[in-house]
Regions:
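Cys-dependent protein tyrosine phosphatase-like superfamily
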Residues: 1-4, 221-231, 236, 245-249, ...
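FabD-like malonyl-/acyl-CoA
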Residues: 1-141, 194, 271-301, 305
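Alpha/beta catalytic cores of group-transfer enzymes, especially the acyltransferase/condensing modules
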Residues: 10-12, 38, 100-252
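Short, solvent-exposed amphipathic alpha-helical segments in soluble enzyme
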Residues: 22-23, 147-149, 184-186, 287-290, ...
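Non-catalytic positions within long, well-ordered alpha-helices that form the structural scaffold/packing
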Residues: 76, 184, 265-268
Length: 311
């Protein structure tokens, strides 16, 4: 069986998300490394919260990276095999690149904190938003967003193509509101505003891409030891400078998740393991391709369960 690992991004965090594996030595070491890299107690933040602090993007990004890497290290320490290919949803791509040996964890933790700060500062809080659109095809969502942009005078774009009939839009708050109205009129089953602080992956985040470019120039990237399919081009890259460029563009470009899972299927992947808190990506997998199974590894019990099937 060919299997892949995928790493979740923002939105899957929860207080206590590492409790079941926190006594594992490799997990304790990961938490210690993250705390030293940030100069604050990451283990305490994850274990105790509060949820409001965990949901601030400047905290969410480093703690979700830490959680994804902790679960991956726990998997390997328990005797799990390395996957043939990996990917990560948005921030999760950084977790995948750490697991693939491209970025050291020590460098990645402050990098994603910087990414979060750059993304948040690109658009003033309260002026941008996101919404999940359910029940329409991608082409309709793209077309209606263009109409909403024209009608409102603000930017609104499709930014996460997560599964058939599940697209996330982002942009200026008024434009997102207008798009939700028009999308409901066009037949959307639901248009749900998301509790986020910035219009992630929209072109409004171009200033964040520029800042990231400067920061990434100072960090050493290595050739990956495991293939990683990137969000922005749905490509497997080996050249470290090309990987950096893809991450720069990723901040202000859509996450092409449906295509990512389909690309894995083309490579013969039959099982996708979601490595980290939550079960969102595992749930999306079957909806994208019914020949591929999605299984989550989000606690000690699920780790052992999946390990037994993939050893």
């Amino acid at each position: 069986m060919t299997f892949a690992f995928v790493f979740p991004g923002q939105g899957s965090q929860s207080v206590g998300m590492l409790n079941s594996i926190s006594e594992r030595p490799e997990v304790r070491a990961t938490l210690q490394e993250a705390s030293e890299a940030l100069g604050e107690d990451v283990a305490k933040l994850i274990a105790e919260g509060p949820a409001e602090a965990l949901s601030l993007t400047t905290n969410t990004q480093p703690v979700m990276l830490t959680a994804g890497v902790a679960f991956y290290r726990a998997w390997l320490a328990a005797g799990g095999a390395a996957p043939q290919v990996m990917a990560g949803h948005s921030l999760g791509e950084y977790s995948a690149l750490v697991a693939a040996g491209v970025i050291s964890f020590k460098d990645a933790v402050p990098l994603v904190r910087f990414r979060a700060q750059a993304m948040q500062s690109a658009v003033p809080v309260g002026t941008g938003g996101m919404a999940a659109i359910l029940g329409l095809d991608d082409a309709t969502v793209i077309k209606v967003c263009a109409e909403a942009s024209a009608a409102s005078g603000g930017v609104v774009e499709a930014v996460n193509f997560n599964a058939p009939g599940q697209v996330v839009i982002a942009g200026a708050s008024d434009a997102v509101t207008k798009a939700c109205e028009l999308l409901k009129a066009a037949g959307a089953k639901r248009a749900l505003p998301l509790p986020v602080s910035a219009p992630f992956h929209s072109s409004l985040l171009q200033p964040a891409s520029e800042k990231l470019k400067g920061y990434l120039a100072e960090i050493e990237f290595k050739v990956p030891t495991i293939s990683v399919i990137n969000n922005v081009d749905v490509q497997i890259l080996n050249d470290p400078s090309a990987i950096k460029d893809a991450l720069v563009r990723q901040a202000a470009k859509p996450v092409r998740w449906q295509e990512t899972i389909q690309a894995m299927a083309v490579q013969g992947v039959t099982q996708v393991v979601e490595c980290g808190p939550g079960k969102v990506l595992a749930g999306l997998t079957k909806r994208i391709n019914d020949q591929v199974t999605g299984v989550p590894v989000f606690d000690e019990a699920s780790l052992n369960e999946v390990l037994a099937t993939l050893k």
